[in-house]
């Protein structure tokens, strides 16, 4: 009798496991389709953020808080972030991505550092703000992990692993909690092989109301410009 019971359990698993996978795939396709529809309407977004950088070797967390904004211009995306505090201490700094370059401004040093951003940065910029489901599926293997409520919003939890040759080798995987109806992520966790991770939580999100003037750094007189 025990043997037949075990056989029934195995048979049930063989039957229902594929059905569960099909159901998850159907939910994922629904999420990606909603993101496609929302992405078409996306123009800009701004939000408050909390970034938690975890360093595994010393088991420490570094928290930064501030505001961030994104804007779509043609086929490209611009981003500006204003860090206000570091571990709750005032530590203003600004980061601007525009025209393929990253500008890092440190007011306390009166220094602007300009870097070539590289070819893959926009894949990460659009990962949670205005990116389409089609683009997401083109660059990542996506595992649908159900829904979770964040800040009163039902989000789809997606785990992303890099596709081979997609240029996403900086991270082992990324987990994001996305509101597919707005193509906006409310939370992201980025994991590296070293064990380091970065968690970003976004709140007070406003869509399609960011002026173009926001995507420029306000440099103090006498600021030194360094290009690397």
Residues covered by each model-derived region:
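Envelope-exposed proteins and targeting segments
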Residues: 43-45, 64-66, 77, 91-93, ...
